From Swiss-Prot:
<keyword id="KW-0344">Guanine-nucleotide releasing factor</keyword>
<dbReference type="GO" id="GO:0032760">
    <property type="term" value="P:positive regulation of tumor necrosis factor production"/>
</dbReference>
<dbReference type="GO" id="GO:0050731">
    <property type="term" value="P:positive regulation of peptidyl-tyrosine phosphorylation"/>
</dbReference>
<keyword id="KW-0862">Zinc</keyword>
<dbReference type="GO" id="GO:0032587">
    <property type="term" value="C:ruffle membrane"/>
</dbReference>
<feature type="coiled-coil region">
    <location>
        <begin position="561"/>
        <end position="588"/>
    </location>
</feature>
<keyword id="KW-0597">Phosphoprotein</keyword>
<keyword id="KW-0399">Innate immunity</keyword>
<feature type="coiled-coil region">
    <location>
        <begin position="772"/>
        <end position="841"/>
    </location>
</feature>
<feature type="region of interest" description="Interaction with DYNLT1">
    <location>
        <begin position="104"/>
        <end position="134"/>
    </location>
</feature>
<dbReference type="GO" id="GO:0032991">
    <property type="term" value="C:protein-containing complex"/>
</dbReference>
<feature type="modified residue" description="Phosphoserine">
    <location>
        <position position="619"/>
    </location>
</feature>
<keyword id="KW-0498">Mitosis</keyword>
<feature type="modified residue" description="Phosphoserine">
    <location>
        <position position="102"/>
    </location>
</feature>
<comment type="function">
    <text>Activates Rho-GTPases by promoting the exchange of GDP for GTP. May be involved in epithelial barrier permeability, cell motility and polarization, dendritic spine morphology, antigen presentation, leukemic cell differentiation, cell cycle regulation, innate immune response, and cancer. Binds Rac-GTPases, but does not seem to promote nucleotide exchange activity toward Rac-GTPases. May stimulate instead the cortical activity of Rac. Inactive toward CDC42, TC10, or Ras-GTPases.</text>
</comment>
<dbReference type="GO" id="GO:0005085">
    <property type="term" value="F:guanyl-nucleotide exchange factor activity"/>
</dbReference>
<dbReference type="GO" id="GO:0008017">
    <property type="term" value="F:microtubule binding"/>
</dbReference>
Amino acid sequence: MKEAKDARYTNGHLFTTISVSGMTMCYACNKSITAKEALICPTCNVTIHNRCKDTLANCTKVKQKQQKAALLKNNTALQSVSLRSKTTTRERPSSAIYPSDSFRQSLLGSRRGRSPLSLAKSVSTTNIAGHFNDESPLGLRRILSQSTDSLNMRNRTLSVESLIDEGAEVIYNELMSDFEMGEKDFAADSWSLAVDSSFLQQHKKEVMKQQDVIYELIQTELHHVRTLKIMTRLFRTGMLEELQLEPGVVQGLFPCVDELSDIHTRFLSQLLERRRQALCPGSPRNFVIHRLGDLLITQFSGPSADQMRKTYSEFCSRHTKALKLYKELYARDKRFQQFIRKVTRSAVLKRHGVQECILLVTQRITKYPVLISRILQHTHGIEEERQDLTTALGLVKELLSNVDQDVHELEKGARLQEIYNRMDPRAQTPVPGKGPFGREELLRRKLIHDGCLLWKTAAGRFKDVLMLLMTDVLVFLQEKDQKYIFPALDKPSVVSLQNLIVRDIANQEKGMFLISAAPPEMYEVHTASRDDRSTWIRVIQQSVRVCPSREDFPLIETEDEAYLRRIKMELQQKDRALVELLQEKVGLFAEMTHFQVEEDGGGGMPLPTLPRGLFRSESLESPRGERLLQDAIREVEGLKDLLVGPGVELLLTSREPALPVETDSGGNTSPGVTANGEARTFNGSIELCRADSDSSQKDRNGNQLRSPQEEALQRLVNLYGLLHGLQAAVAQQDTLMEARFPEGPERREKLTRANSRDGEAGRAGAAPVAPEKQATELALLQRQHALLQEELRRCRRLGEERATEAGSLEARLRESEQARALLEREVEEARRQLAALGHTEPLPAEAPWARRPLDPRRRSLPAGDALYLSFTPPQPSRGHDRLDLPVTIRSVHRPFEDRERQELGSPDERLQDSSDPDTGSEEEGSSSRLSPPHSPRDFTRMQDIPEETESRDGEPVASES
């Protein structure tokens, strides 16, 4: 019992088990508590889970009691210590144990502490100890050390109280000292109230409205800077220095406030400077700002826009966590609660608490589009200003859209990391044909959407699952013991978005079907509402449309594949850095040449421009290697023509010095002659002199032409840029080939020729295709070609198999036909023998009892039965011919009958040995011997009998008498 009781003590808490309702929340994890795992500490009145007791902080009331007891014990011990000599023993005043002003200043930093408990003299531990030496009792030393520790703790509490003593207004005034004039100038509510009434009446109504909006922009920017200053200088500094909070906790409360403060302070300074420039002479209040678009474009474009996007994205994405952390600190830490109350007690900061400041900073970026739109609405007459404001409005909207997108991605990334941390490390699910899918695969993808749904199983039951819509898959997770696992159901838990079809269930408002192609499965899931179902269908369809292919994004990636992917990404990053460096180098070279021309007196030469899209490998305007090389060759030829003259080979000019030639009658200057008629040579080459401004050339219209030096410098800059662009293109092409086609040099050689070759359409002015896009298309075409070749080979094999099978069937058919013909002939001969042996007189054909019914087995035979049923046998002649037919048949076949009896045996045995099913059995009797033919072949052979009869009609026949 003692051990069980001791186990209930955790961090000073005395926990007891209680019964609670289902709505009771845990103080530690903020989740609902069931009746079996509820614990309560009666000392501090905290209710938590049984599993959360180790994570709870120390009991506050127990800690306070211990501190009070220790302080009381220390005071008692100090009172019993004599620090003076025996003759002048007296009790030391209580003020002597308090810290000095210098010690408090070291804790308070630069603030001026004026606590009523401050001391005039300092005291140290050795001063308290007095005449004690090393032989003093150890217990007394311990008491003194504990007393100094308690003094430090009390000094920290007093430093917090000193913050309100010196006044939040004083601190606020110190923070806003840099913008003191701005605060006074923008104290009025609007521009109409800030300027003089006489000055106001001089302007139109549209100008008043425009200036009111500009005034509001500057005023709100000033208030925003004030909010940031309060967050940085007042709250954050106080938490770090006064409360001694961890820097990570304070950074979680106020992320990126320094960067935001710098951005908006710089922008506010520019606005105030523009306002100062717009002041009317002799008046510190009256101003009209006519141009503001240029400042807005500078603020919301370029590096400033990139910095704003980065800082606001991070701040807004951590907005929810910051508020949650603030509420937790305010609920748990009494010192933090006291600090916030004292700081916000003043009238200046009453509406600027921590939560209000965080919300104001988050909403600030959304105010710019509204203000700029209103300024543009009331701006008339200045077209350039309207264009600048329109451009600035577009830039602000683009910035806001990018920030929203970044915030959404960061929030989804944080949500994905949270899910990953809660997943069971051993959780895996098999993917058909791919292998196990573990939780590491989640971090490779981006989370697009997630939510709790009901999965209807094959048995008709509903399972609570968490569905994650990611880059290329749908993942189903199930919560078990506060951990996420893959549900063990009858269908895979990972569904590929490749060719995924999503359909709503017609008779249900919340249900939808997910039809997967690989493997072919159909999932039925149900959302919480109809709106949730519509949202899921919309985001799934959008993700299916942009789903990457399996070649670019495999479903499951091994460690080697991940390593190769990282290397490829690093190579691409290095290529981009190389391109940026080359572009910067070419720009510096162009500026250098421009500066040299200006020093030489050619100030009219514009800055050389570089080809647009020269270093942009992602754009469609990026030239390929062969085009860059051809352009560079043309620039070299043009430079050669400019230096040595057209029509002169560069090889000759490098070997033989050019001679000065006089100007011809047509006014053309020959090689070696300068523009002013002077020829200068140096080491066999012609030196190009600088043309004077008075002797500059002009065209027929009188326009100023470029001097030869300017033309040469322009071509030199172009050549420099083209060569570096060629270097960048070659580097990117090499990386592309090594990354995409590592299987052999032949394929890389083909790709090189394809990428460097410009078609006729490109030369005609069509936009060239990017190398990476061309390589992707080439790989796709090669893959399609391989698939078509394989399909063609498969079709050929199938055709050969079908032809072989058809040949074998045809051979079997011929064999069966031959066997059947042989059997039919034998059966016919047997029937003739039976007819000759069994009946001396034939039966009348018209006798109904002589007709044998059709064998049922013949009904299954093919067209032979139809011919048999439609055949009408020839009718024998009346009277005498009717009796002569069987006699003729009998006389004709008697020799054959005798021979058959001797060699083949009885006809019955011959019929039994036959394999033909129509030859019958012994049970059919004599009627089977007169059965008609069952096939057309039998009919054609039976026609010979009447012919033989007719051929013997001329012979004399003996009468019966």
